[in-house]
Amino acid sequence: TELTGTGWALQNPKDYIDVLKYIIPEAVAQSGVSSKDIIGIGLDFTSCTMLPVDENNVPLCLLVKNVSRPHAWVKLWKHHGAQKQADEINELLKKRGEIDNIQFGGKISSELLLPKFYRL
């Protein structure tokens, strides 16, 4: 979900849990494949999607005390809320002569981990 006018793109991690609990079992049942023949399930986040968790790996946004805290939710790769921090990082790298055009295309995007983490 994008918060209008903010550049934020957040998601509820319960979506992933619901897929594991409801959608996958239904898909397996409809497929006719025996669950004994399934050796694994892959899960992937687009780089860089961040899922903050507590010490028990519970997503922070699923805890009542954090529901209204945007930084507790999954930040999708398309989250641009850290553009200011990305600009600051790029300026510092430019001043220090550390921009690597081959690896980065010349700049750090607000979609990457470092600007999102720096914003905290």
Placement of each model-derived feature along the sequence:
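Glycine-rich phosphate-binding/catalytic subdomain of phosphoryl-transfer
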Residues: E2-L120
